[in-house]
A protein has these predicted regions:
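Active-site neighborhood of glycoside hydrolase catalytic domains
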Residues: 282-288, 292, 297-417, 422-434
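Short glycine/serine/threonine/alanine-rich loop segments
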Residues: 79, 195, 265-267, 400, ...
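Contiguous, structured surface segment used for ligand recognition
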Residues: 19-164, 506
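Extracytoplasmic/secreted cell-surface and envelope-processing proteins
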Residues: 62, 179, 208-210, 279-281, ...
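Bacterial Sec-dependent N-terminal signal peptides
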Residues: 1-28
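Feature activates predominantly on carbohydrate-active enzymes
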Residues: 100-335, 390, 394, 488, ...
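Active-site beta-loop-alpha junctions enriched in small/polar residues
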Residues: 174, 203-207, 274-278, 341-345, ...
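Flexible, acidic glycine-rich loops studded with aromatic residues
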Residues: 401-417, 422-514
Length: 515
């Protein structure tokens, strides 16, 4: 595959304005995402066995990054970089620590005799190396020696730093389980394009994918379904299933290894444990967590929104506290994503327990619109806010903060919650204007399960239509946003919902190059 295509992955992030010359240069050099500044120079730096590698002796993490570069050049180019204390009078690749630069920023200077990579923090050096890789032949990403490639780097001056602190991609592994090998590949792709958050969607109606030792039935029962929808999902459309059991989950040891691997590439793994909706996989394992434990629940073989949700009972809260205790030990991330989306209130309206709890808590239907979103919310909406706030308090007590989909705005927002805005941009803007951090991930701009070509010629998807141009044109901070909103919109994220992505290859097809 041509370099210009292979590097056009995961580039909806780090959007930065630049002059026309910079734009043309970025196109010429195929650097993704486009750097803040790129200035072409004359000549090329030739990589060979005479090149020295210079790294500060008192920066062990930077030395590790430089060593990885040297190892990859040895593997793919057959070039052995010689270590040196100084670049003076030598043809060298030099890593220079410079205080005061942006935390994740870097400068890359290439002349015919010297490559200088300057940053203040290890992740800045890591991102600079990713840019250097993109200036090299595509063979640099391989695992075999390629003596035919042109192992040289064009002379150039590059300066870059990210616009957002959260630059993420969500992978849904519930609707279709993803083999562990692909998880590592996925992380590699994020790292290659300087993304720093892997949002791991681990629980849903269609499967529970994380081992919880206190509750073994979650994976014994909740990780499996008897069949899977394979044709279009429409209410009045005949549903066709494959008739095959589908399942899989990740052990805690596997998760620890993934988290460590991601950390080595400066990627934070944020787990998502859905509540109070999208509960069927858990209810199939533990029906006492529902509002009607006499029912039989099954892991869903199809998509959609289901009325069977978690009951806001002490049993449920004790369950989630036990789950979160184990999740916290696996994920060092500051954030835990608690879902909060698409929670129908029918079961709560019909539950004597829930209605009694509503009265006990003094919850009432709104008589005036909410100051946050301008909508009158029901007492059941406020019960969801109680659910979310209670879990937030527990996680806060463990040193964690929560992220939730924008429905957590309904009925009142938990004090320290970050909102992930998926139903358009309004949720994120409302949260930001109210002083809460927001991550923009709006449907349809960054929903990668949508069609990207004419449906008549494309594989089956969930629907929608989202072109490459539409995705790339999205600006997460509207031009008319006030200063408070600008301050609190902390990032952007693409979402890969895998309703019809049965294989890793299909996932790649849907995700790229839009992601």
């Amino acid at each position: 595959m041509k370099k210009s295509i292979s590097l056009l992955l995961l580039s909806l992030l780090m959007i930065t304005p630049s002059c026309q010359k910079t734009k043309e240069a970025a196109n010429e050099y195929n650097i993704v995402p486009k750097p803040n500044q790129i200035l072409p120079q004359e000549g090329r730096f030739e990589l060979n066995n005479k090149v020295c590698l210079v790294v500060p002796s008192d920066a062990p993490e930077v030395k590790s990054i430089a060593a990885s570069l040297a190892e990859q050049l040895k593997l793919t180019a057959g070039i052995s970089l010689k270590e040196a204390e100084s670049a003076d009078g030598k043809t060298a690749i030099s890593f220079v620590v410079q205080e005061g630069m942006p935390k994740e920023g870097y400068k890359l200077s290439v002349t015919p005799s010297l490559i200088t990579l300057t940053a203040s923090q290890p992740n800045g050096f890591f991102y600079g190396v990713q840019t250097l890789y993109q200036l090299l032949p595509p063979a640099i990403y391989g695992k075999q020696l390629d003596k035919k490639a042109d192992w040289s780097v064009p002379a150039v001056e590059i300066e870059d730093s990210p616009r957002f602190v959260h630059r993420g991609l969500m992978l849904d592994v519930c609707r279709h389980y993803v083999p562990i090998d692909y998880i590592y590949k996925f992380i590699d792709l994020l790292a290659m394009n300087k993304m720093n958050v892997f949002h791991w969607h681990l629980t849903d109606d269609q499967g529970w994918r994380i081992e919880i030792k206190k509750y073994p039935k979650l994976t014994e029962i909740g990780s499996k379904r008897e069949k899977t929808l394979v044709d279009y999902y429409y209410v009045n459309y005949p549903q066709i299933f494959d008739g095959k059991e589908h399942g899989g989950y990740y052990t805690q040891e596997q998760i620890k290894d993934v988290v460590a691997y991601a950390a080595s590439k400066y990627i934070n793994v944020v787990p998502e444990i859905e509540m109070p909706g999208h509960a069927l996989a858990a209810l199939a394992a533990y029906p006492e967590l529902s509002c009607d434990s006499t029912q039989t629940y099954k892991v869903s073989p199809t998509w959609g929104v289901f009325e069977q949700v978690f009951c806001p009972s002490e049993t449920t809260f004790k369950f989630f506290e036990g789950v979160m205790d184990e999740v916290i030990e696996l994920f060092p991330s500051e954030y835990i994503h608690i879902g909060g989306d698409e929670c129908p209130k029918t079961a709560w309206k019909n539950s004597a327990f829930c209605q009694q709890l509503i009265r006990q808590l003094g919850l009432k239907d709104d008589t005036t619109p909410s100051k946050i979103d301008g909508i009158k919310h029901s007492k059941e909406d406020k019960l969801q806010s109680y659910f979310v706030t209670r879990m937030e308090k527990y996680l806060n007590s463990k040193g964690k903060n929560i992220i939730g989909w924008d429905e957590i705005l309904e009925g009142g927002l938990a004090p320290n919650a970050t909102v992930m805005s998926w139903r358009g941009v309004e949720g994120g803007m409302n949260a930001a204007k109210a002083g809460h951090n927001a991550i923009m991930t709006p449907n349809p701009y960054v929903y990668l399960d949508y069609y990207q070509e004419e449906p008549e010629i494309a594989p089956t998807t969930i629907g929608g239509y989202n072109t490459l141009k539409k995705t790339y044109s999205y600006n997460p901070v509207p031009d008319d946003a006030d200063e408070l909103a600008k301050k609190h919109i902390i990032g952007i994220q693409g979402n890969i919902w895998r309703e019809y992505m049965q294989t890793s290859e299909r996932t790649d097809y849907q995700a790229f190059p839009r992601a």
